[in-house]
Amino acid sequence: MAQINRKNTLRNLGVSEAMRRQVIQLDQVKSIDHGITVLIKYKINALLIVDSRGQSVGVVSKTDIMGAYYAGLPIESPLEHIMVTPPLFCYSGDSLEAALEQMRESGVYRLYVMDKGEGDIVGALAYPDIVGLLYQYCHQCEYSHLQGGTRSGQDDPVRRFTVREVMTASVKGIGLNETLNTVMETLSAYRFGAMLVTDAKGLPCGVISKTDLALSYRHGVDPEVEAGTVMSSPVSTCDVGLLLEEAIKKMTIADIHRLFVHKVNPDNIVGVLSLTDAARIRSGSCYACVSSRIKVNDHD
């Protein structure tokens, strides 16, 4: 990842500075089973699918795999049966602003990156990559909270983003005894990446992600089993008043994509903060760089 001079503005950043250079490609005739294995091995959320000539023809994400699980497709089915076409591209020389706008307009979470000269695929750009760049930008800044450049609390002259300002305020929980099919229906309906699982008292006791569902599919778990049998626990949470910079650090260290947000009591879940939420604010973690936010349309 590029070393960023703190004098730069986010508006001047390019796709090549944020993109991930490792692109995992699989032939369209490979099985869903094999695709899940590769996704888990490389800790990625999607695969670029190619034909026998090596040409990019589609994308298979964990959402597509969840759909196959729900539909009861044999796990030996080829990836071409569930891939989404066509894959969407941007160029390595494009501005990050333009790429983010393309992702927003297309309703996608990633773009594949092409070299404008040769036309080769040279990388992939997703929201976590953008957050990584923003986090690096903040960490190098003289105003960084984590660098100790300013004091916290009332003595801090810089107004900083908190989790409350960035999180998604609505949280849809599902009961411990609901089936995986119900979990998948809810994830699909609300376009969530994970579901909070609650016990008989309505208290959070676990999380089911699309990764958990993909593994259940691969292991032949009946989708009618109860959510509690495959959920992950404990629930990773943070306080609603936590600084955004601290929350991103927590997700980075734990290698997770979301934190459920509590207010005062960890059992009182009031929202969820994802890396996607953090990327969509188009700025760093405080108002010191608010003037350098990437411009978007007024309706965004």
Language-model region placement:
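Tandem CBS (Cystathionine beta-synthase) repeat/Bateman regulatory domains
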Residues: M1-D300
